[in-house]
Amino acid sequence: MTNNSLLLTESKVWIKRKDAPGEVVRVIPDMESNGRVTAYQLYTAFEQNPDYLGQILFDNEGYWIYDGDILTVAEQEQVARFILKGEG
């Protein structure tokens, strides 16, 4: 997988939660100096002072890892799928 299909602009994604209301998450690409995106910062979407939800980091193969402790595995997977589609 190449980095070309990853999300390149700030976007919002709706995540479904198992035992709580869903939430909209703001996804912000973190560009490297060479223009490649390797990480995405995650925040609550509509608050004046948004809460930081962690980050998702990608390698050149399209594998990802979540760096944070707020999102469940299912929620992480929803955000990662959204990013991998490259749509926003």
Where are the language model's segments positioned?
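Short, contiguous, helix-prone interaction/anchoring segments in small proteins
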Residues: 33-57
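Mixed-charge, Lys/Arg-enriched low-complexity segments
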Residues: 2-16, 49, 53-88
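Negatively charged, low-complexity tracts enriched in Asp/Glu with abundant Ser/Thr
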Residues: 1-42
